[in-house]
C-alpha cells in the first residue's frame, strides 16, 4: 500500500514542477496542464456570455444582419464563387422576405421601402461615377431591404443591378437579374430590352429576337427593337447554316474513320438535295475521282 501511495505522488510532483513560478499566472497555467481542452472551452464562454444579452436585439435585426453578411460575401476577386453565392443568396432573400412580411407591421414595410430607395439612389450615383462594383453592392443591399410586396420597386432594383453587372461583364448573372425584374413586372420594357441585349451578346439570338419582338408589341416606337427584329433573322439563318456545316464536317470525319478499313471514304457517297422538296438522296460512287 505504501508503494502505491508513493507512485500516486509522482504525477503530483511532476505536475507541481510544471507550474509557472509567477503567482499571477499560476491560476491560468494549471488548467492548461491539467485540461488543455478546458481552456479552449473557457475561452469561448465569455464570447457566448457577451452575445447572450443581445439575443433579442439580434433576432429583431436579423434582416439587417442578413444584408450585412450578404455584402461581406461579395469579394470582387472571387468571380466563379461569387456568382454562385450571389444567385443563391438572392433566391433565399426573396423567400425570406415573403415569410418576414406575414407579421410585419405596415409602418415597418414603409420604413424599409424608404431605406431601400436611399440605397438605390446611392447605387445610381455610384453607377454614374463608373463604380459598377460598388453600385452592384448598393442595389444588392436595397434588394435585401425592400419588402417583397413592393414588386415594381424590386423590379427596378433587379434591372439596375443587371446593368451594373453587365458593365462588369457578368452577363449570365445580369440575365438572371433581368429575368427576375420581368417576372415581377412583365411590362417593364427597359428590363426586357436589357435582357435582349445580353442574349445577343451571349449568342442566344433566338431568345434575343423573342425579347425584341416582345418590346415592339408593348411599344412599337422603340427603334432599337425594330432594327433588331429586321437584323436578327438573317443572323440566325447564317448561324444555323454554319452549325449545320460544322455538324456535317464532324459526321464526315466520323464516316471516314469508319470506312477507312474497307478502302472507302465519304467521297464514295454523294449527297444530293432535291430543290423542289428539300429532301436529300445518297448515291454510291465506286470511283468518285473519275466523276469530277
Swiss-Prot record:
A cellular-component GO term for this protein: cytosol
Spans annotated as Disordered: 1-125
TPR repeat residue intervals: 116-149, 155-188, 189-222
Phosphoserine: modified positions: 90
Keywords, in A-Z order: Phosphoprotein, Repeat, TPR repeat
Xref: Pfam families: TPR_8
Ranges annotated as biased composition (Basic and acidic residues): 1-12, 47-64, 99-125
Start-end of Acidic residues biased regions: 88-98
Subunit (UniProt): Interacts with the GAP domain of NF1. Interacts (via TPR repeats) with HSP90AA1 and HSPA8.
Full protein name: Tetratricopeptide repeat protein 1
Species whose genome carries this gene: Mus musculus
Gene: Ttc1
Amino acid at each position: 500500500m505504501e508503494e502505491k501511495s508513493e507512485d500516486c505522488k509522482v504525477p503530483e510532483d511532476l505536475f507541481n514542477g510544471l507550474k509557472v513560478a509567477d503567482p499571477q499566472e499560476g491560476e491560468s497555467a494549471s488548467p492548461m496542464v491539467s485540461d488543455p481542452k478546458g481552456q479552449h472551452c473557457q475561452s469561448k464562454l465569455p464570447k457566448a456570455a457577451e452575445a447572450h444579452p443581445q439575443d433579442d436585439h439580434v433576432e429583431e435585426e436579423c434582416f439587417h444582419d442578413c444584408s450585412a453578411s450578404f455584402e461581406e460575401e461579395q469579394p470582387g476577386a472571387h468571380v466563379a464563387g461569387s456568382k454562385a453565392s450571389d444567385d443563391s443568396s438572392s433566391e433565399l432573400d426573396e423567400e425570406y422576405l415573403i415569410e418576414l412580411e406575414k407579421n410585419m407591421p405596415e409602418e415597418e414595410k414603409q420604413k424599409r421601402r424608404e431605406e431601400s430607395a436611399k440605397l438605390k439612389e446611392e447605387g445610381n450615383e455610384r453607377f454614374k461615377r463608373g463604380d459598377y462594383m460598388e453600385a452592384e453592392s448598393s442595389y444588392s443591399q436595397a434588394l435585401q431591404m425592400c419588402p417583397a410586396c413592393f414588386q415594381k420597386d424590386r423590379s427596378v432594383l433587379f434591372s439596375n443591378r443587371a446593368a451594373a453587372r453587365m458593365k462588369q461583364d457578368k452577363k449570365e448573372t445580369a440575365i438572371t437579374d433581368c429575368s427576375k425584374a420581368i417576372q415581377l413586372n412583365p411590362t417593364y420594357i427597359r428590363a426586357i430590352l436589357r435582357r435582349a441585349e445580353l442574349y445577343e451578346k451571349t449568342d442566344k439570338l433566338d431568345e434575343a429576337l423573342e425579347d425584341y419582338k416582345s418590346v415592339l408589341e408593348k411599344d412599337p416606337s422603340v427603334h432599337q427593337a425594330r432594327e433588331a427584329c429586321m437584323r436578327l433573322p438573317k443572323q440566325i439563318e447564317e448561324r444555323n447554316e454554319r452549325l449545320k456545316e460544322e455538324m456535317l464536317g464532324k459526321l464526315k470525319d466520323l464516316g471516314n474513320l469508319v470506312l477507312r478499313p474497307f478502302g472507302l471514304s465519304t467521297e464514295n457517297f454523294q449527297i444530293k438535295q432535291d430543290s423542289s422538296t428539300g429532301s436529300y438522296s445518297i448515291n454510291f460512287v465506286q470511283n468518285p475521282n473519275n466523276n469530277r
